[in-house]
Amino acid sequence: MILVNTDYISKKELETLTIVKGSTIQSKHLGKDILSGFKTLVGGELTAYSDMMNEARAIATKRMVAEAQGVGADAIINIRYASSAVMGGAAEIMVYGTAVKFV
């Protein structure tokens, strides 16, 4: 499966199939949440949250790819990510794009 954030794939003629998406909501363990709170006092990267967001992006992308495979896509173009805070310590990641087939 080819994944790109452009609206084309060089040297490929494409047939548009449908919009595909994937999402997940992730939260951190309370202990790590408290430790991250202390980290905000001194500054620096909140690695627990960076790791959580990276994991969430991977899960959401995997779900989007599975949906695209289900409709027989060869690639997903124009991929975009969006995130939002759902509640303290939890975030939603959504990824979406256009499933296409090579002609």
Curated annotation (Swiss-Prot):
Protein source organism: Alkaliphilus metalliredigens (strain QYMF)
Recorded hits in Gene3D superfamilies, A to Z, give:
Hypothetical protein apc22750. Chain B
Indicate the family of this protein. Answer: Belongs to the UPF0145 family.
PANTHER family for the chain? UPF0145 PROTEIN SCO3412, UPF0145 PROTEIN YBJQ
Write down what this protein is called. Answer: UPF0145 protein Amet_0532
Q: Name the source's superkingdom.
A: Bacteria
